[in-house]
Every structure is written in C-alpha cells, then in structure tokens.
C-alpha cells in the first residue's frame, strides 16, 4: 500500500510505521516498518515563507527625543523551515543609536548574534521551524542632522537567503522641540 506524508510531519523527524497482526488466537505481533533501521522515512524540508514588519513608538518625535523601533518577523508556513534569518537596519542620517538599547523579544530560538556597529543594527537567528513572531527592539535619538518637518524613512532588511528579502520601513517626521517661555 502507499501513504502520503501529510502536513503534520515535521521536516527532519523520522516517522515509524507500526502494524499489528492479530489472528485472535495467538498473541498479536507488532512488526515495525521499516524493518531495516537504515531506511527510515524522513520527510523533506518544506520551505517556510517570511513576513516582516517595522514599527516605531512615536512617528512625530521632537528633535533630540529618543524613540523605539521594533522589527518583527515570522514564518507563515506551518511545519515550514526558515533556514537562517538575518535582520539588518542601517540607520539613516538624523538618527543616532542609543547604546545598549538593542534587545530581542519572542520565543526560542533567540538570535545567535545581536549587534550594533557604526549605525548598523544586525540580528542573526538560526533555523526557525514554527510560526511564532520574533522581534528586535532598539532606541535611537533624533539628532541635530534631522530637520523639523522633513520625513526620515528608516528601512530594515529581513532575509532568510531563500525567499525574496522583506524590507519593512516606517517614516517619522521630527518636530521642533518645545522651548519653555520665559516669564
């Protein structure tokens, strides 16, 4: 007989097929298939599909104010695999990274690498085999290169080397700081 390996099979995990032979007189036998252990059924890896978003906690910050970005991604295919996911975000002119503000949020596996160097944020995740959302968060200060009323577009790149990379972006429009009036 033939079988179809269905959606419940996990890529890379062996499936053991057991049969029961019972003549209702003698004790039943339970032969295991495959008989030769070197021939287990191992489902092929099903490719995952990547989706990513980027948000900011304040789209109209004052000049000199700190804001927080969140870059999130997930695999949208049940039992699919994203091999290695790399998030990069080159901060545009007008934004300065806040030291030690970079964190990851979400279930295991956590990023194997989470760094900031010269205004570039990088997070590397190992193989992702579920559909749970994972995120990185970091703060920036709207610096003196930003101009009030001019939009700053911050774009990230989320790549798993198989699917076309996602490039989520979010604009902010800095505003003049409130200056106290002297009475």
Map each language-model feature to its residues.
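Exported/extracytosolic protein signature
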Residues: 1-183
